[in-house]
């Protein structure tokens, strides 16, 4: 039976937390998010913040993005970005290393929406079908994105039409990810 995005995201997040617990005996930590307020913050120490996911609060959709571009977004993207506040998480899928993007706080959710709008405006200007980024790669020009039309997860090169299928759905993509402890 197929999982929904919410269940798949919670499952991946728990696998990521479990990996950190196995490696360090602690919850996940981030130096990049040190000093940035968040409901996820459970402790700060040695210039890093330890975090655990927290329920998302506020308007649980990306309606601002839809209104700005007069577009209807795929339901999976709403579900992905409005399930939880959490830190970004490293993962592998096949030969690809990803950083799964997450919303850290209410302010971060506003920034995310602005970035999604910018991404979609660029695609519209280049006459590309719309995608919504969910994960970055080691290359600044390559990302994992949800195709807004098909719901497929694709590896795409920013600003080009080059896209490679990663998974048939976002839930399948999340299920297939293997959490990675940061190096």
Swiss-Prot record:
It is a peripheral membrane protein. Its main location: membrane. The keyword Oxidoreductase does not apply. The keyword Calcium does not apply. It comes from the Bacteria. It is found in: Cell inner membrane. Keywords: Cell inner membrane, Cell membrane, Membrane. This is Protein Syd. It comes from Yersinia enterocolitica serotype O:8 / biotype 1B (strain NCTC 13174 / 8081). The lineage of its organism: Bacteria, Pseudomonadati, Pseudomonadota, Gammaproteobacteria, Enterobacterales. The gene is syd.
């Amino acid at each position: 039976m197929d999982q929904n995005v919410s269940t798949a995201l919670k499952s991946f997040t728990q696998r990521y937390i479990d990996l950190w617990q196995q490696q360090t005996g602690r919850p996940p930590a981030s130096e990049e998010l040190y000093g940035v307020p968040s409901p996820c913050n459970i402790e700060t120490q040695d210039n890093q913040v330890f975090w655990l996911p927290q329920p998302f609060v506020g308007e649980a959709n990306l309606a601002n993005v839809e209104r700005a571009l007069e577009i209807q977004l795929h339901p999976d993207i709403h579900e992905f970005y409005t399930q939880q506040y959490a830190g970004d998480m490293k993962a592998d899928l096949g030969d690809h290393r990803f950083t799964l993007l997450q919303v850290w706080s209410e302010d971060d959710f506003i920034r995310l929406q602005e970035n999604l709008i910018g991404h979609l405006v660029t695609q519209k200007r280049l006459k590309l079908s719309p995608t919504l980024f969910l994960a970055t790669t080691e290359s600044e020009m390559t990302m994992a994105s949800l195709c807004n039309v098909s719901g497929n997860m694709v590896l795409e090169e920013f600003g080009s039409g080059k896209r490679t299928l990663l998974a048939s759905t976002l839930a399948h993509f999340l299920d297939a990810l293997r959490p990675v402890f940061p190096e």
